[in-house]
Amino acid sequence: MVYIIKYIQVNKKRGSKYMERKQAKDLLDFIYDSPTAFHAVETVKNILDENGFREIKESDKWHLKSRDKYYVIKNDSSIMAFIVGDEKIEETGLRLIGAHTDAPGFRVKPNPQMISEGKYVKLNTEMYGGPIISTWYDRPLALAGKVAIKGASPLKPETRLVNINKPMMIIPNIAIHMN
């Protein structure tokens, strides 16, 4: 939402057709840049930073000030942003807007590589979120997510976002005569 509001404010003087096209393009860019909830949080975080919001940690004691803008990230997959009003919440209330950023798909399991017949590699995956399986068959698929790599301590690996935005794999459908 902040993403779209930002461009409405900047471009509202240029006419509604321009605004509509710009908003549509910005939304598509956001979707392409955010193939997972982790990527969406990173994209929203960058937008919030550009618009004067400050990150606060869930575990810290909060010292909120009127009219200040804040956000909190949880598990790198959820983000909550808010602006503190200058009136008493008991009198004026509270307004919240929420969005869901994860989607059905397949998650790669730890120890993902499965060699089949010594000729090709299969990924060991699990379904997430109840996808409609038939829509995934016989189409090129990319790979995106969060990976853990060796860090300074074995107990604290570093994480990186990965988005290999090109066709890498396919889930083949069963032959028509076998279905």
Where are the language model's segments positioned?
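N-terminal hydrophobic/helix-forming segments and targeting peptides
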Residues: 2-179
